[in-house]
Amino acid sequence: MTKLCTVTLVLLLALYCRAEERPAAVTPQQVDEIVDHLLSGLGDYVFPEVAEKLQSQIRAHRSEYRAISDSNALAARLTEDLRAVGRDHHLTVSFGEELGVQKEPTSAEKQHAHAFDLADGHGIRSARRLPGNIGYVDLAYFSPDSDAGTALAAAMQLVSGTDALIVDLRRNGGGSGETATALLSYFFEEVTQLSSIVERKNGQPLERQKWTMPYVAGPRYVGKPVFILVSLRTHSAAELCAYDLKNTHRATIVGERSGGDANSSTGGEIALGYGFSAMIPNGQTRSPITHGNWQGTGVEPDVATTASDALVAAYKLALTDAKPSVESEGLTKERQLALQDPQAALAEEITGFQKK
C-alpha cells in the first residue's frame, strides 16, 4: 500500500477507532517541543518561499501557544495560523489522531477499515442507467481499500452500454490518488501522461510522472461523451480527475468552481509528539498541458451552474450529445420524454443531492 493510501486508511480508521488515550492538557515545555517539531517539518513545505513565511508566523506566536494548555485548542490555533499564511486547506495540525504516524495499522485495524469501507460501498454511492441510456456514477470519495478497483470495475461494467456518462464528484473530498488514477484510466484508449508530482524531500525537489494505467479491470469508456459534476465541496483527488479530463478534452466539466486543493502530502503525517501530528503538503501537481494546477483557484467548469442544478444541466447535454448505440421505438420515446422533462427523469438524484 502506498503512503497516500496508508494516510487515507488512517482517516477511515479514525471514523470508528478511538485513538490511544492521551492527556488533554499540555505544558509550556511540551508546547515548545511540539512547535519545534512543526517548524522543522515546515521546511519541506512545497513552496520554499511560503515555507519561510509559515515558519515566521509560528515563531511570532510562540509565546501565545505556550499559554494554551488545552490540546485541541492548541491544534486548532496552529492550524488557523498556518492556513492564514499558506492559504492551503491541507495544512493541518491534529491532536489525538496520530494513529499510524509512527507505525502501520495493525491487522485488526485494517480488517475494521476494510469492513467499514465495504459497508460504505467503497465510496460508490450510485451506479445506474438513467432514462435515455445515460450512465450515472456517484463517487463520494476515492477508496484506498484493496477491493476499490474491483468495485469501480463493477460500476463501469454496469454503465458500459450507455451512450454517455455522468460522473458525480460534487460531494467528493478526495482520497486515494491510485483509485482516482484508476477511474481516469477508463476514459483513455492509450496510456497517457496526466500530470507530474513535484515534491520536496529534505529541501530538494523531486519529480514523478503520473500516467494512466495500461490495464483496468472493467471495460474502458472511450469514444463516448463524459460529463464530470463538480462543486465547491469537490477537493483534492476529485479535482485532479476533473482537471485532467478537462485539459485533455476528454470530458465536459459542469457545476461550480471546485475547492482549490492541489497540494499533497506524499510523506503522510508528521509526528509532533504528545499526541500531535501535522499534515504538511510537500508536493504539488503539475499538468503537462497547462504547466500549472488548480491550487487556490479550483477547477473552472466548462458549463457553470449551481451545484444543485449541475446534474440537470449535464443530463440535458448528455441526451443531446449522445449517439444512440441501439435504435428502437422505446428508446427513442424514452430520450424524447427525458429531454422534455429532465427534472422528472432525475427526481431521485436531484432530491438526494439537495437533502445532503
What role is predicted for each listed range?
Residues C5-A14:
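Bacterial N-terminal signal peptides
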Residues C17-E21:
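Boundary at the C-terminal end of the N-terminal hydrophobic targeting segment
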Residues L38, L82, V137, V167, ...:
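Terminal peptide-recognition signature
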Residues V46-G132, S328-K356:
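Extended, small/polar residue-biased N-terminal targeting/export presequences
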Residues E97-V101, Y141-D145, R171-G177, Q193-L194, ...:
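Solvent-exposed loop/turn segments at secondary-structure junctions
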Residues I124-G149:
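STAS-typified acidic loop motif
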Residues G175-P225, N263-L272, I280-Q284, P288:
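Gly/Ser/Thr-rich loop/hinge elements
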Residues G292-K356:
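Low-complexity, Gly/Ser/Thr/Pro-rich intrinsically disordered linker/tail segments
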